[in-house]
A protein has these predicted regions:
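Short coil-to-beta transition motif at edge beta-strands of beta-rich domains
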Residues: 2-16
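Short, flexible beta-strand-to-coil junctions
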Residues: 13-18, 48-52
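Exposed regions on extracellular, virion, or secretory-pathway luminal proteins
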Residues: 30-38, 54-55
Length: 89
């Protein structure tokens, strides 16, 4: 998990539509305020995501989405390791 992502950082997350790892780039950082469903603030990032695996050549732009900061990873391997860890418990 990335503790302090910055705008412009390339990150990995699980796509909510395909459940597959996706390369993205942070475009903005925001906080979802507390409300009746979530009584605490939830920091998140607006992310452009790409159809590639190399940050130096990310491939075609596929879209934009928002992702909770707790769900962002620096590398694809870190993301895959976190999935393996959560499924073995």
């Amino acid at each position: 998990m990335i503790m302090n992502p910055k705008i412009g950082d390339y990150i990995w997350f699980i796509c909510r539509w395909t459940d597959l790892p996706v390369l993205g780039q942070v475009t903005s950082l925001k906080i979802d305020p507390a409300n009746k469903n979530f009584p605490y603030e939830r920091p998140y990032a607006e992310v452009d995501w790409y159809n590639g695996e190399n940050p130096s050549e990310p491939g075609p732009w596929c879209g934009s989405t928002s992702v909770l900061l707790k769900d962002l990873y620096k590398t694809k391997q870190e993301l895959l390791d976190s999935i393996k860890f959560s499924t073995t418990q």
